[in-house]
Curated annotation (Swiss-Prot):
GO molecular function (one): phosphopantetheine binding
A GO cellular-component term linked to this record: cytoplasm
Pfam families: AMP-binding, Condensation, PP-binding
Lineage of the species this protein comes from: Eukaryota, Fungi, Dikarya, Ascomycota, Pezizomycotina
Cofactor(s) needed by this chain: pantetheine 4'-phosphate
Catalyzed reactions: 2 L-tryptophan = cyclo(L-Trp-L-Trp) + 2 H2O
Annotated region described as Condensation 1, given as residue ranges: 883-1293, 1586-1978
Protein name: Nonribosomal peptide synthetase rstn8
InterPro entries: AA_adenyl_dom, ACP-like_sf, AMP-bd_C_sf, AMP-binding_CS, AMP-dep_synth/lig_dom, ANL_N_sf, CAT-like_dom_sf, Condensatn
Classification via PROSITE patterns: AMP_BINDING (PS00455), CARRIER (PS50075), PHOSPHOPANTETHEINE (PS00012)
Domain Carrier: 763-840, 1438-1514
Segments of this protein annotated with the region Adenylation: 251-638
Length: 1981
């Protein structure tokens, strides 16, 4: 053979291994498969047949017509492997060739076998003859270039063996390849003269294997509709979450309801089956609603991508014939250009739903074969083509493919894909069909902060392209369990990164086959990254690319065809294109009516049936995950180059990134002549300027037509477009050209839409610009010198992935910030830098703080010595140690004042881990050295009136080391109280052997975040011996002192002029914070980088919060408090002290203003405030009445510079100090910081914003606050995404879901107050609620201006304070009393101001000019404003005692008021007493030798209460926590003795399960002796009759209570060894559950509920039972039954309130508090005082028993009855307890309460005297005695109000009523005795009775009646699951008991008596007498 020297392409057989090429093998080996057969032809003919068959086989598997392979002849076989040669043979043939002509042309070259390496051009070989020597060598040479060898042994029965390398071909493929080869060889030998094209290549064995692989595919589609499957989920799980989106969540029930509205609207407009409705939405939950609404209407939908050019959208809408389009409100304007009818969802749909007139067109339901949606893809004709997918196809695919993708009802699916791609439809609908949840990030989150959005939305299933997955970290999204990748091939590294952490699936599917056609499930680390898995839902067939009627053998490349029910209907309006790719009944498919889609993808099939993607056979390509039809781009581009040939191709540039290149055949005769042969593709060198001008114009035009990903990056002119031999564009040549371009050649033809745009920006030369360039280069893997100002980021190789990476990098440069949108919108690097710069501070901020301040120079120079002496005295140091003294900043003063009020507040605790080799002594020295250079660390704060009239001073102490405490690891950290005069910093060194820790404790008055970093830097520098920097704080204080107060006052006055803001929340007592009621909740917002250059994140957050407040107050004028870093002024950046400042921020929202304009205005506003931000709240408050209103803000917004941990973790402190997370401290710190009813703290992080809300739960519920945060999230996302939208549009789109906002406004708005007032006062009266500032006050008051025609203007012409006459005056007084005593959640007016209705405001159409009303009211004192209601007895009280007058003068001085303006009963907080004022007030009191703490001031509500506190300070201390069983030690000594004793009393319970035990109190024992086994119960009705109660949830809620309260797990048992004692034994868990009775009849429901639950003689069980009863109609009752006086009424009320909160999913109190045992311990100590019994002996001396006699015919039963009412019920003889109700309506409740308030009487006193009057009339006795129940909760025990147990007692109430005494005197006497009885209330009644009656042995009791005054056991005002008490029955040892329940407007008395005692008529008489007695007292009042 002759060697021929010409170039041919390599002929490399493809790898057919399903194992990873990187997987190592234990040894070198080869797979071998042999076969033999008998032949009758010559050996030469056989070998030629084998060679020819091998050629055909290689041609099929390499998809080539030029075949090259190696041959080893028989003579070479016996040689040594070093000498063996291989001849390379080449064959070229055509399908029309005759077989004899297809022979190897010649031997081209020879190779030494052992020299064959990886660079070989062939990898297959035929060996003819013996092969033993070199074959062994080949098997043991793993890197040999030959991978496949066919060995032929000649003979009568030729034997052939195929050897393959395991790393190259798996064993199954070897067998399949042998089968194919043998089949080809048989055909060749049988038809030696035939044509090549007639040779059948695919054997039947392969065909059968393919049939087996497709056998699981469904033959028929699922006959279902998408919306029907979703509707079933809605019915099955209506409350389950269907959508979790950035703009709100939606349950399945809500989704069903909202989509039904859309359906109704569409059907009303004639939309039905086969109608196509386009949808134009941004990422939103409403997209899902619109999609489902269209499907329900029977129509099909098309999702439009908002970012696409309008021309493309118009083309699609024209193609579908759109008449109606659904849009969001933001897209409505664009939508109006696309269809005749435009409707936004939800706004227009809700407003324009058709009325129910019965004329709606009949609904035609969609059928499974109707179109469900149309998905548009790129089209080769220049227009996108729409694929029609039917319901049946989509449902089949969803049901079949979901299991393979691990998609199910528990999946929370990320909706990431653009609406332009059908994957978005799969992500949206399939989860809903399965019962899962669709999670939708915003457009900004999707691009800028995807990882954070995934966490926030709790995504656990997502489908992404590999390019996007590279942005994510598996460790940072731990909730994600399944990742599906598709759209492009995944790299081996990316596959390995994910496969080890979560379930990784690879999905494949063209839009024509319903999204997902093939899945590679559960990919392992060693899986094939090119594999697209196996068919699911559709059958898989691989055919010859040019002939779909011929199947290729398994393993050979071919075009992928997908068949089955998932194949779409075809292309809309394109029958030719449909027929070309949607084929029917090919010859290899036996079944009829089978449809297949030709994907155009070239693939091959592995031996296990999986498919490997190889590429495309046509011009459709994938670029960055996007499917692109090159023909469409070419079609559109040709319009910009008329007459020129164009071609578009994708190729990899020099930097490895793919690029879209447009080639243009630039007509130039000169160049055409020079182009010929091999250089015909040479680019044009001349005429470049003209061409580039055209190229820029073309790119700009294409950007308006095509999506951005289809616009070419580079446009290149060519002499001619290269063509292939078939006269088609030679795309391979174009791709090769792209690959060969150098960097300079690429830059030569990069085109921008406006290449001159960079000229607008000057040359940049600076550190920040250079740093940004370095980051661009690093992201793009370039050298910085290659990045020039005019370069475009994307033309340098950037893409969306690198844009996100660059955005994150830029954010690390101070004062620079870039969003991804900024990068996309920047034409050049210069513009990129311009966009990244933040707005600098103006020069007007100069001058800054002074550089140096002399010691003591900020004090009065004449008093410096006095200052030093006093400071030394307060700090406990010598005067010589005082280094400096200067005032505190306003915030420091407030922080210390709050700490005085609440010890422990504002103290930071930080744990630092230390390395094991830390030098502790040196570290201690380093801290003290740092304190030398940071005076703030040596600073203490003092508060003394002698120095600064109560204004705190800070004292810098020298020669005092930082307090340093060393403890062992096992010891607890010592607590040092920080207060005035004490050190405010100390360190605790824990010298643990293996984990040493340093704990830093420091008060916030000393540091902020900047100072914290300064401290750590200074300690590190000192430890390392480096120089330190002096950082004083006094210069900043001087700056604050030197602020021009007049300018500041003028500024703040101007700032709040005309303020119309409504305080939020409208709490009842403004300014009074209840720390025990503070709760918190947290929400994380996914936060993209803001896309407004120069706008700070703070401005964005402030705007969003202002919009939230606007939504909740209904006002566009909002005010809230804000705390800032205070380091905006020059020189403040490095100040060594806390500079944070708080001030009220006012923001007015303007509906016509764009978001961009509003942000800029807010930012400029913040800059204007900066010079005055240190003014302090107290100074701002005094600048004007409006300023005072602004300073009374009820909500605070705090924006941290960053999360403390995330910042500090980045500090270079290792290995000295490593900060540990101390989340619990942060939470407690913010709780202590919560001085307002609502405090919102924002902590920005990397791509997210953590927002915590701390709120007073007595004012706001958790649900309300969470809704506000969700509203804030929605608004912030809208602000970020739509900067050009108007404020009005954004506000209208951010309404709270499900009407929650409306409900809140209804509950809190001033409108409700005005409405109720009008209803109360009747017709002819007008009302307006206005916030005013009365004269001599600085606290806003809510006033109710009332206008009526009957009012007359006062004589001096003032238009307010009109004369008020009866009956209006009485109605006004009653109304105010009702509002103030029964707030019911509304805003509560402080005063009422009558106004004549004839008054005409300056603004027409309004009853009242609010501005003028505020101004007029400010001229009068509060006393004057309320003078109209005075009738000789004013509610304003002057001091009665000298002490009260002293306190009033002190407070008046602090508040700058006249003493006469303050009443001794005025609320202190309402007067303006905040923490700082309280501190100053305490200092003034100290000046008068009155020692008051700030806590005492706030505990008192008025000066009178404060005077009472001073007169008698509480003696009790809070009860310390007790050890378990501690109270039993006096009785048993140890626990074992207790268990042995008590086990005998327990029936069936293991006493070792107890966790505590303690004895009963003496008071409880006294009750037990009388009550015996008396039982009580209360029955409630739950909810409304229409409300269905979930009994399972209700029972679980009660068991939750049982776990929370030890009392509900407590046995009450008698002690065997001490018979007089009973014990409480607390179990670890409850042994009894909840009794649930269902399916009862309504008529018998209450009767069955009354049946007893507890046995009367059983011991050892729980002393209570809880049961729930429900009727068949849903009416629900619950019952609590108890005995042994186990629970008092107050405990039942506590339990019911907590049960309601649990059912309403609201937080409850701390489960560790309170403890009933602590109350028992207190009482045992209390009982040791003998004075208590001595009081009762003295108080009841001479008393005769007061016994109400039984009815005449009941006398003989009375004694018998008393013996029976504790006995068992036998034979029906047990006495019955009868209860009768008598509702007593107090006609003038206002007068009664006023009478009580004026004389310091209580309602209980009134009722006791009334019962005494009743007994006097019934018995004729004047010395009355009866039992009176007391709650027992007015003791100094922590949280006694929430203790559950038996705290009550029955006291002997003695009231002497001689005829000479008036009722008033009796009331006053009894009120005094009530206080004395309360001081001794815990004595056992049994002991008291025995003590008093010791001289009367014939008497057994002091009385037989009892009075109980209680709060209602159900609160009708409560929201949520209401409990309405139906009946309460309490068995008692008394013959008759009166239970009076006091409601705000009535008193309801129930009289209970034993059947043996009296009859109903007698009971009615007693009740009537009691009612008359109450009325008699009221008349006397």
């Amino acid at each position: 053979m002759v060697n021929l020297d010409f170039e041919v392409e390599p002929c490399l057989f493809p790898s057919l291994s399903t194992r990873s090429v990187n997987q190592s093998h234990g040894k070198a080996m080869a797979y071998q498969h042999g076969f033999e057969w008998e032949v009758t032809i010559s050996e030469d003919s056989v070998f030629q047949g084998i060679v020819l068959s091998w050629n055909i086989l290689l041609a099929k598997y390499t998809d080539s017509t030029t075949i090259t392979f190696g041959v080893i002849s028989g003579s070479e076989g016996n040689k040594c492997h070093d000498d063996t040669t291989v001849d390379e043979y080449c064959t070229s043939f055509h399908p029309e060739s005759c077989l004899p002509t297809v022979l190897p042309l010649a031997s081209r070259r020879q190779y030494r076998f052992h020299e064959w390496k990886y660079d070989a051009r062939i990898n297959t070989c035929i060996a003819n003859g013996s092969h033993k020597v070199w074959l062994d060598h080949w098997i043991n040479s793993p890197n040999h270039g030959i991978k496949l060898i066919l060995v032929v042994e000649q003979g009568r029965w030729p034997c052939m063996s195929l050897y393959g390398k395991p790393s190259f071909i798996d064993e199954g493929s070897v067998r399949l390849l042998c089968t194919a080869f043998q089949h080809i060889l048989d055909c060749v030998l049988e038809n030696q003269m035939g044509l090549l094209k007639n040779i059948e290549v695919t054997p039947s064995h392969h065909y059968q294997r393919i049939l087996d692989w497709n056998s699981h595919i469904p033959k028929e589609p699922l006959a279902e509709c998408i919306h029907d499957l979703i509707q079933r989920r809605c019915m099955e799980t209506p409350d389950a979450e269907a959508i979790c989106a950035w703009d709100g969540t939606m349950s399945y029930a809500a989704l069903e309801q909202e989509s039904a509205r859309t359906m109704e609207w569409l059907q009303h407009h004639g939309v039905g089956p086969e109608t196509i409705v386009p949808l134009l939405f941004e990422k939103s939950k409403w997209t899902v609603v619109a999609v489902l609404g269209v499907l329900k209407a029977g129509a099909a939908f098309v999702l439009l991508e908002t970012s696409h050019p309008i021309e493309r959208l118009k083309s699609i809408c024209h193609d579908i014939g759109a008449c109606i389009i659904l849009t969001s409100a933001l897209c409505k304007e664009i939508g109006s250009n696309l269809a005749d009818i435009t409707m936004s969802v939800p706004c227009d749909v809700e407003r324009k739903l058709p009325c129910g007139d019965g004329k709606m067109k009949p609904c035609i339901r969609a059928q499974p074969r109707n179109a469900a949606y149309v998905a548009y893809t790129s089209g080769s004709t220049g227009k996108p083509k729409g694929v029609i997918i039917e319901h049946a196809s989509f449902c089949t695919n969803a049901m079949v493919s979901s299991e393979a993708q691990n998609l199910n009802g528990c999946s929370r699916v990320l909706q990431f894909a653009s609406y332009a791609f059908d994957v978005s439809i799969h992500e949206t609908l399939v989860p809903l069909m399965l019962g899962g949840c669709v999670c939708i990030p915003s457009a900004s989150q999707r691009v800028n902060s995807l990882q954070e959005a995934i966490v926030q939305l709790r995504v656990n299933w997502m489908e992404l392209t590999p390019s996007v997955t590279r942005l994510l970290s598996p460790h940072k999204i731990p909730n994600v369990k399944t990742l599906v990748v598709g759209g492009e091939s995944i790299s081996p590294a990316e596959l390995a990164r994910w496969a080890g952490h979560i379930r990784l699936n690879v999905a494949y599917g063209p839009a024509e086959c319903t999204v997902v056609s093939m899945v590679q499930s559960n990919v392992t680390k060693h899986g094939d990254p090119l594999s697209i898995g196996r068919g699911c839902g559709g059958s898989v067939w691989i055919v010859e690319p040019q002939n779909h009627n011929v199947l290729v053998p398994i393993g050979a490349p071919g075009e992928l065809l997908i068949g089955g029910p998932i194949v779409g209907r075809g292309y809309l309006n394109r029958p030719e294109q449909t027929a070309a790719v949607f084929i029917q009944n090919p010859p290899w498919q036996a079944e009829n009516n089978s449809r297949f889609y030709k994907t155009g993808d070239v693939v091959r099939q592995n031996s296990d049936g999986s498919v490997v993607f190889l590429g495309r056979k046509d011009t459709q390509v994938k670029l960055r995950g996007q499917r692109i039809e090159l023909g469409e781009i070419e079609y559109q581009a040709s319009g910009f180059f008329p007459g020129a040939a164009v071609a578009v191709e994708v190729g990899k540039l020099y930097h490895g990134h793919p690029a879209l290149v447009l080639f243009v055949e630039w007509k130039s005769l000169e160049n055409r002549k020079r182009c010929s042969g091999t250089n015909c593709c040479r680019t044009v060198q001349n005429d470049k300027t003209h061409f580039m001008s055209n190229a820029q114009w073309a790119k700009a035009g294409l950007s308006q037509i095509l999506p951005s990903y289809m616009v070419p990056d580079i446009i290149v002119p060519l002499c001619t477009i290269p063509l292939s031999h078939s006269a088609k564009v030679d795309r391979k040549a174009l791709r090769a050209m792209i690959t060969r371009w150098s960097k300079d050649e690429v830059k030569l033809y990069q085109v921008t839409a406006n290449s001159t745009s960079c000229g607008r920006y000057p040359h940049h030369a600076g550190q920040k610009y250079d740093e940004m360039v370095r980051m661009v280069a690093r992201v793009l893997s370039l050298d910085p010198s290659e990045v020039r100002e005019h370069d475009n980021f994307f033309q340098l190789g950037g893409d969306s992935l690198s844009a996100i990476m660059l955005s994150r990098e830029i954010d690390t440069i101070p004062l620079l910030s870039l969003t991804v949108a900024d990068i996309f919108q920047s034409a050049s690097i210069a513009e990129l830098f311009h966009r990244s710069q933040k707005t600098p501070l103006p020069e007007s901020m100069e001058p800054g703080i002074p550089t140096k301040v002399l010691p003591f120079s900020l004090l009065d120079p004449m008093k410096i010595d006095n200052y030093r002496e006093r400071a030394a005295e307060h700090c406990g140091v010598s005067p010589s140690q005082i280094e400096d003294i200067y005032p505190c900043s306003p915030l420091q003063a407030r922080l210390m004042a709050r700490t005085s009020r609440q010890p422990g507040a504002f103290q930071g605790h930080f744990n630092f881990r230390l390395s094991l080799d830390t030098d502790w002594d040196r570290l201690h020295w380093a801290w003290n050295k740092a304190a030398d250079f940071l005076p703030i660390l040596r600073t203490r704060i003092i508060n003394t009136w002698q120095l600064a009239e109560g204004n705190p001073l800070q004292v810098v102490v020298r020669d005092k080391d930082i307090e340093w405490v060393e403890v062992a690891a096992s010891e607890s950290e010592p607590k040092s109280r920080m207060s005035f005069g004490s050190p405010l910093i100390y360190c605790v060194a824990v010298r643990a052997k293996h984990s040493p820790v340093l704990i830093l404790n420091i008060h916030h008055a000393l540091f902020d975040l900047v100072v914290f970093e300064q401290i750590l830097e200074a300690v590190k520098a000192a430890y390392q011996g480096k120089p330190l920097v002096w950082r004083p704080f006094s210069p900043f204080i001087k700056y604050v002192q030197d602020l021009n107060r007049s300018q500041a006052n003028e500024f703040w006055k101007r700032e709040f002029t005309g303020l119309r803001a409504v305080p939020f929340p409208a709490d009842i007592t403004p300014g009074r914070s209840n720390l025990d009621a503070i709760r918190w909740t947290r929400k994380s917002f996914c936060l993209g980088h803001q896309n407004q250059a120069g706008i700070t994140l703070s401005s964005l957050i402030r705007l969003a919060w202002a919009m939230v407040l606007s939504q909740y107050t209904g006002s566009l004028d909002v005010v809230f408090g804000t705390t800032v870093m205070g380091r905006n002024m020059p020189g403040t950046a490095d100040v060594g002290g806390p500079t944070i400042a708080t001030y009220p921020l006012r923001i007015t929202l303007r509906g016509e203003e764009s978001i961009k304009e509003a942000l800029q205005r807010i930012q400029n506003h913040g800059i204007a405030i900066a010079p005055f931000e240190q003014s302090g709240i107290q100074h701002i408050r005094h600048s004007s009445p409006e300023s005072a209103i602004a300073c009374s803000f009820r909500n605070m917004l705090v924006i941290q510079p960053s999360s403390d941990n995330s910042l500090l973790a980045k500090r270079d402190l290792s290995p000295l100090l490593v900060l540990e997370e101390r989340g619990s401290w942060k939470q407690k710190s913010y709780v202590n910081f919560s001085t307002q009813a609502l405090n919102v703290v924002c902590e920005p992080g990397a791509g997210h914003l953590d927002v915590s809300a701390y709120f007073d739960q007595s004012i706001l519920s958790s649900q309300e606050v969470e809704e506000m945060l969700s509203c804030m999230d929605r608004l912030l996302q809208l602000v970020l995404q739509h900067p050009d939208a108007s404020m009005g549009t954004i506000l209208s789109q951010s309404q709270s879901p499900d009407g929650d906002l409306d409900r809140y406004e209804e509950r809190t708005s001033l409108a409700r107050l005005e409405q109720e007032a009008c209803q109360y006062l009747g017709n002819g009266v007008r009302v307006a609620a206005v916030w005013i500032i009365p004269m001599a006050s600085h606290v806003p008051k809510l006033a109710l201006f009332v206008g009526a025609m009957s009012l007359n203007t006062v004589s001096d012409g003032r238009w307010i304070l009109a004369g008020v006459k009866e009956p209006l005056r009485t109605r006004l007084v009653q109304m105010m009393h009702e509002f103030q005593n029964n707030p019911l959640g509304r805003a509560v007016p402080f005063c009422c101001i009558p106004v004549p209705l004839q008054y005409r405001p300056s603004m027409p159409g309004l009853f009242l000019d609010r501005a003028r009303a505020q101004e007029a009211a400010s001229k009068f004192t509060l006393k004057t404003l309320t003078s109209w209601q005075n009738t000789g007895d004013s509610g304003f009280e002057e001091p009665l005692l000298p002490l009260e007058a002293t306190l009033r003068r002190a407070l008046a001085k602090v508040l700058s008021l006249e003493p006469e303006a303050i009443g001794v009963n005025d609320d202190l907080v309402s007067l303006g007493c905040d923490s700082l004022v309280a501190m100053q007030f305490a200092a003034q009191c100290d000046r008068q030798s009155l020692r008051l703490t700030i806590s005492e001031i706030f505990q008192a509500t008025s000066l009178r209460c404060l005077a009472s506190t001073l007169n008698s300070r509480p003696s009790g201390d809070p009860t310390p926590a007790l050890e378990a069983f501690a109270l039993l030690k006096p009785m048993y000594g140890d626990r074992e003795s207790f268990e042995q004793d008590i086990q005998r009393s327990v029936d069936g319970w293991n006493i070792k399960e107890s966790i505590d035990a303690f004895p009963c109190t003496t008071a409880h024992l006294g009750l037990l002796s009388g009550l015996g086994t008396c039982q009580s119960h209360t029955i409630w009705e739950i909810g409304s009759p229409e409300e269905q109660i979930d009994l399972v949830s209700f029972a679980k809620a009660w068991l939750n209570l049982v776990n929370r309260h030890a009392a509900l797990r407590t046995l009450l048992l008698p002690s065997r060894s001490n018979p007089s004692e009973w014990l409480h034994v607390v179990l670890k868990s409850s042994p009894v559950g909840v009794k649930v009775v269902t399916k009862l009849k309504n008529a018998s429901l209450l009767k069955i509920a009354r049946k007893p639950l507890l046995s009367r003689d059983g011991l050892g069980g729980l002393p209570y039972r809880f049961a729930v009863y429900q009727s068949t109609t849903g009416r629900t009752l619950c019952k609590l039954e108890a005995r042994y006086a186990f629970l008092d009424a107050f405990s039942v009320l506590v339990l019911m309130k907590e049960l309601r909160r649990i059912l309403d999913c609201l937080p409850t109190s701390d489960p560790l508090l309170p403890s009933y045992s602590s109350w028992v311990a207190y009482l045992r100590r209390w009982s040791e005082d003998p004075l208590h019994l001595q009081f009762w002996d003295r108080y009841l001396a001479g008393l005769k028993p007061c016994i109400l006699r039984a009815s005449r015919n009941h006398h003989h039963h009375q004694h018998e009855g008393r013996q029976h009412h504790g006995a068992s019920e036998t034979n029906g003889n047990r006495p019955r307890l009868i209860k009768s109700h008598r509702q007593i309506v107090v006609q003038d409740a206002v007068a009664l309460r006023k009478y009580c308030d004026q004389r310091e009487l209580t309602i209980t006193n009134i009722l006791q005297v009334a019962w005494a009057l009743t007994l006097k009339e019934q018995t004729g006795i004047e010395d009355i005695c009866f039992g009176a129940l007391v709650s027992g909760r007015d003791v100094p025990v922590d949280h006694v109000g929430n203790i559950v147990g038996s705290l009550f007692n029955v006291l002997a109430c003695r009231i002497q009523m001689p005829a000479t005494d008036s009722i008033s005197s009796v009331l006053l006497e009894n009120q005094q005795m009530m206080r004395e009885r309360a001081s001794h209330q815990f004595c056992s009644l049994q002991e008291v009775t025995r003590l008093v009656l010791k001289a009367r042995p014939e008497a057994s009791s002091l009385f037989n009646t009892c009075l109980s005054v209680e709060q209602p056991l159900s609160d009708e005002a409560e929201t949520g699951k209401g409990f309405r008490a139906l009946e309460t029955v309490e068995e008692t040892e008394y013959d008759l008991i009166v239970a009076a329940t006091v409601f705000p407007d009535r008193i309801q008395a129930s009289i209970m008596y034993w059947s043996y005692f009296c009859d109903p008529a007698r009971a009615a008489t007693i009740a009537e007498t009691f009612a008359q007695s109450i009325e008699r007292i009221i008349l006397c009042a």
